[in-house]
Amino acid sequence: LRKINGPSLHDSFFVDHARHSRLLDSIVDLMGPDVKLFGDQLFMKPPGGIEKTYHQDCPYFSIEPMAMITAWVALDDVTEENGCMYVVPGSHKIGAVDHSEPWMVGQRRDMKIPDSAIDLQRERAITLRAGGCSFHHGLTQHRSGPNRTDRFRRGLATHYMTARSQWTGGPDEQ
């Protein structure tokens, strides 16, 4: 099990987390006062877990306008060795980038941003202590490295969008 989508739909603990004043105050500072919860995900990168290639979150989530910020809370210490996130600062200003390059994850086909569209010289590692939090825009180009340790790397991603953003996908996609 690598990911659990929508834990807040099943346990009020995650709803309370999304409403926590320190988290919401930061989101409001970044997005303004009219925000709503889009969803959340638990990520569990196991020992030996593979990388996740460069992507943007918004193209995976069918919302318009693409105004989303993710609060990513580390449940374990997050290091370069256990698969931290890498971001290209300011890349959200470019807008949505075509995720046109195929990438195989075991038997599952995924898509990634072509390497030619990424400014790797600006890449920055986001390391966190357990309980630490990072924020990134839904159009920020980011990836995570492989887990080369014998410990899990777990995190809780809570996605917020502006109140004017709307779900544009089908009912089975959400």
List the model feature ranges, each with a label.
Residues G39-L42, A71-V73, L156-Y160:
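A structural signal for short, well-ordered beta-strand segments
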Residues D11-D16, I118-A125, R143-P146:
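Active-site rim elements
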Residues H10, F38-G39, A67, E81-G83, ...:
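Residues that flank catalytic or metal-binding motifs in active/ligand-binding sites
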Residues P46, L75-D77, Y160-T162:
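Non-catalytic surface loops within mature trypsin-like serine protease
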Residues L1-I63, H99-S100, P171:
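Non-heme Fe(II)-dependent double-stranded beta-helix
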Residues E101, C133-F135, L139-Q174:
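Non-heme Fe(II)/2-oxoglutarate
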Residues R122-F135:
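Short acidic-glycine-tyrosine-enriched beta hairpin
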Residues D25, E51-A125, S165-E173:
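Catalytic core of non-heme Fe(II) oxygenases with the double-stranded beta-helix
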